[in-house]
Regions:
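Conserved aromatic-histidine-acidic binding/catalytic patches
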Residues: 51, 55, 59, 110-111, ...
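Short, hydrophobic/amphipathic alpha-helical patches that form generic packing surfaces
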Residues: 35-39, 124, 208, 212
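Long, amphipathic alpha-helical segments that form or neighbor coiled-coils/leucine zippers used
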Residues: 173-200
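Nucleic-acid nuclease catalytic cores
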Residues: 53, 69-167, 171
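Short amphipathic alpha-helical face segments that pack within enzyme cores
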Residues: 62, 117-121, 209, 216
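Amphipathic alpha-helical coiled-coil segments and their boundaries
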Residues: 200-210, 214
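Metal-dependent nuclease catalytic cores that hydrolyze phosphodiester bonds in DNA/RNA
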Residues: 1-98, 105
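Extended, charge-rich alpha-helical segments
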Residues: 212, 219-281
Length: 281
């Protein structure tokens, strides 16, 4: 990792940036508030650079050049902006516009909400700018699209209030936010303390009881599946295809070395299940 990138990452830890606000809003598919807290408090392992990240940085000038060519607006770079704990790493400014460059393998049916949140966050640094543009290059077909994000001062104020509260409540206080997933729990508590005991509250006792029921049900289902698999295999013997009296294919079983495969989708479809069952699964 280059010294410049290390410095950039260190600066990001000093506050909430555009990609961070989407995490706090629950929009990010990549990180949770626990991930963010571990990062901001210096507890997270450095995220290694990867080919996708490098490609995005390398293509950014090309995306911005395409934007300038298509819109006729010149673009300029301004670097990192800091307003207390609020941080913005804006890709570029154009006349009357904040511009964020994105690359994606495939096109979008709609702009990902975490990108919209990022641009809205950046608009908060420029009171007179009413629109942010997401300039997106799609690598699969080389197409280029511009998606505008209109300023909403109420949303920006809410974002800043949320960021301030979260920063004070968790980063300044050095208290982890509530975990949202099993992965969060593993990240927060990487090892247990021998012989340490906690008393289960009512909700947890209910979960333990439900877990026992579900595991017992899962075992029953697994045993039932195995029983029916055996019945089909025993009937097929060395045949590859099983059909009904009308000749319609019910199942196939191919054995290659030590592997076996039964086409259970074909079995299910041949049994003409009700539409409600299909919809439920």
């Amino acid at each position: 990792m280059s010294a410049n990138r290390e410095q950039w990452l260190a600066e990001r830890r000093k506050g909430i940036g555009g990609s961070d606000i989407a995490v706090l809003l629950g929009m990010s598919p990549f990180r949770t508030p626990v991930d963010l807290w571990l990062d901001k408090t210096g507890r997270a392992d450095p995220v290694p650079d990867n080919p996708s990240m490098r490609l995005g940085r390398e293509l950014e000038p090309a995306v911005l050049a395409r934007y300038a060519e298509q819109t006729g607006r010149g673009v300029s770079h301004i670097g990192t902006l800091v307003d207390g704990i609020f941080i913005a790493n804006v890709d570029a400014l154009a006349p009357g516009r904040v511009v964020e460059a994105k690359t994606s393998r495939h096109g979008w049916d709609d702009v990902p909400e975490w990108y919209r949140a990022q641009v809205m966050w950046y608009l908060g640094f420029f009171p007179r700018v009413k629109t942010g543009d997401i300039a997106a290059l799609f690598l699969m077909d080389g197409s280029f699209h511009i998606y505008p994000v209109e300023r909403d001062d109420e949303t920006i104020a809410g974002m800043r209030e949320l960021a301030t509260d979260w920063w004070n409540r968790y980063v300044i206080a050095d208290v982890a936010p509530p975990p949202m997933s099993e992965a969060d729990c593993k990240a927060l508590w990487k090892s247990h303390k021998a012989a340490k005991t906690v008393v289960a509250v009512d909700g947890v006792r209910e979960s333990i009881g439900k877990l026992k029921e579900l595991k017992a049900e899962a075992k029953r289902i697994a045993d039932e599946i195995e029983r029916h698999e055996f019945a089909v295999m025993r009937e097929m013997r060395d045949a590859e295809i099983l059909t009904g009296p009308d000749g319609k294919k019910l199942a196939s079983w191919k054995q290659n070395k030590d592997s076996e495969r039964v086409d259970w989708q074909a079995v299910a479809e041949a049994m003409n299940p009700p539409q409600e069952l299909i919809a439920a699964n």
